[in-house]
Amino acid sequence: MAHEPDSQTVRLWGGRFSGGPSEALARLSQSTHFDWRLARYDIAGSRAHARVLHAAGLLDDAELAQMLRGLDQLEADVASGAFTPSPDDEDVHTALERGFIERVGPELGGRLRAGRSRNDQIATLVRMYLREEARAITALLLDLVAALADQAEANLDVPMPGRTHLQHAQPVLLAHHLMAHAWPLIRDIERLRDWDRRADMSAYGSGALAGSSLGLDPEAVAAELGFSRSVPNSIDGTAARDVVAEFAFVAAMIGVDLSRISEEIILWATKEFSFITLDDAFSTGSSIMPQKKNPDIAELARGKAGRLIGDLAGLLSTLKGLPLAYNRDLQEDKEPVFDAVDTLKVLLPAFTGMVATLTVNRERMAELAPQGFSLATDIAEWLVRQRVPFREAHEIAGACVRVCEERGIDLPDLSDADLAAISPHLTPQVREVLTVQGSLESRAARGGTAPARVREQLAELRKAIDDHRAFTQSHA
């Protein structure tokens, strides 16, 4: 059964059809429930398009002025909620064209369609939207990195057990560990900025796929919409969505990085670890167990990482088999990336609050730092500095661990006689590295956990935060 639209419905196609689409097709095709968020960008594109129509001699001065007034009114009505999509509007473009025609009349309103297609419109609008959101997400990431830096600075002298395979490995400073989570987030920001260079191309002027024959200037539209250039190939401009997929990848990578932090926070907040206490404002309780204090933000972040990965996987699956140029499958590119944006924008502020307000149990971390024979590597490397070959030094350090296990003691508990019995190379001077502080101080190369290097690293991280702030304030 054909769908009967009301008399106000605008359809951007249909002249060669004897009737309207079926109700089932109309419902399947409709996208205003998710693409309406692009309305502001669509209107900005229409303004720029009107100006190039005027520059090409296709609108006179009065027509351009009337068009711009109509678009200004439409934008105000969209912002206030006075104008919204109707059930018969197919997408954001048709809804806004209907609103535009209602404000300037069908004759002038119909002129705006000349020289553009929904194909080049949507390819441009999505770039505009994502470039703006990339800056918003960058600002939120910088807030989180700053919270990690603040916690690192507040705990600069706190040792903790560094781990590999979740087993005690070597002592490190808590500040060093926290910044190990901050740097991947900085790289996520760098990915967003690098992505922005590729997203900085307008597809306006590509038409449906072959470009325009009306003498329009794509570079003028690009400049007005905040792009540095227009696409060099009209087919690529309308059909490519790698820019969307790449954004979804960065969002998924951010999710993975947050999930790794979350896993540690969840462990550290357990009774067995007791490394941290989460603030009441960023924890929840149990409906049945009164004593519970649950790390919900960390758990939700861990779960939402899977959602972000799913957004990326779904998008790539949609894109993998599409011939050039535009295909309607590409309507499915927006919901995954919109979901990724929404997920990060609600998750990051909560995550930052959790990190900023957690309390560190310094004594507990310091107590566990030397346990699990975590100073064994220091013995081996001390021996290397005494010119003992590392293969032999490794064996000697391992023998120290074996003796300690047999006697139920830890490495610092070995007497001078014990050490000499294990190897004549183990003189009393080895004790300079048989303390957590000695171990930390010895890791003095760039990137190491020595206190001096960690202070330098913190300054470097603070500078990176400041350097990236400018991107969040730049015009997309």
UniProtKB/Swiss-Prot annotation:
Any one Pfam family match given in the protein's UniProt record, by short name = ASL_C2
> What gene codes for this chain?
argH
Kindly indicate whether the keyword Acyltransferase belongs to this entry: no
Q: In which pathway does it act?
A: Amino-acid biosynthesis; L-arginine biosynthesis; L-arginine from L-ornithine and carbamoyl phosphate: step 3/3
| Keyword Translocase among record annotations | no
UniProt keywords (A-Z) are: Amino-acid biosynthesis, Arginine biosynthesis, Cytoplasm, Lyase
The organism named in the record is: Thermobifida fusca (strain YX)
Chief subcellular location equals cytoplasm
What name has this protein been given in UniProt? Argininosuccinate lyase
Report the sequence similarity comment from the record. Answer: Belongs to the lyase 1 family. Argininosuccinate lyase subfamily.
The protein's GO terms of the molecular function aspect are: argininosuccinate lyase activity
